[in-house]
Amino acid sequence: VTTTTTDLWHHYGRIRTEHDRAVPHTFSWLWNQNGGPGPEVLGDLTGKVVGDLGAGAARHAAHLATHHAPARVDAVDASPAQYAMAIDLFGHLAPRLRIVRSGVVKHVQTMADTYDVLYSVFGAVDFTDPSELLPSVAVALRPGGRLLFSTLAHYLGGAPAEPDVVPADVPARTPNGEATTMRRWVLQEQTWTKVLDESGFTQISVDRLPSTTSAPRSADTLFVTAVRRA
């Protein structure tokens, strides 16, 4: 999750936070957060340094910090509102969970050769120019470190993903409720493969995971993994 001077994530997750304050027992990569692969695809995280890029309220990061024995999980998000929710919900998990308020590009640019694993669940990879973000992510990973992320396989209205690295303007709300837009990158499989290769990654894999629901605004998920070149 990324933001500009106006926090366009101010409202996101607030209702859930009012009634669900527990560390999640599950971790899903799917758009509807129900089924599909789980944290096992991250590999053994014991003693590893992990980062969640665009962590929102840090629910996925809290799950990993609690159940998978990493040395540290950094939950990084630029939104003041999401940062505040994450601190409120999971601040007690420090120091294993480190909640960081920062733009993701700015953060990873200061963390060269730090992370064993970086991941994003419909987070910063969706809302940041990949040609700017992904080279910085590669530098923040240790040689051989892994990037894993889930992203939309198509637009929520059903339109196909983009063949080029171009964003679309999608609906958003300002903190006072006014309608606005933000940029989101919804790219085809081969487009992600190309931009990852150009950004310093190898062993690139892109899998399309079908939606497990027929609810309105459901979507298939692209699950992408890549390794930083040594």
Annotate each language-model stretch with its function:
Residues 1-46, 59-63, 146-175:
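Conserved class I S-adenosyl-L-methionine
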Residues 117-131:
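A short SAM/SAH-binding and catalytic strip from SAM-dependent methyltransferases
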Residues 183-200:
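Short alpha-helix
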Residues 199, 214-230:
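Core SAM-dependent methyltransferase catalytic element
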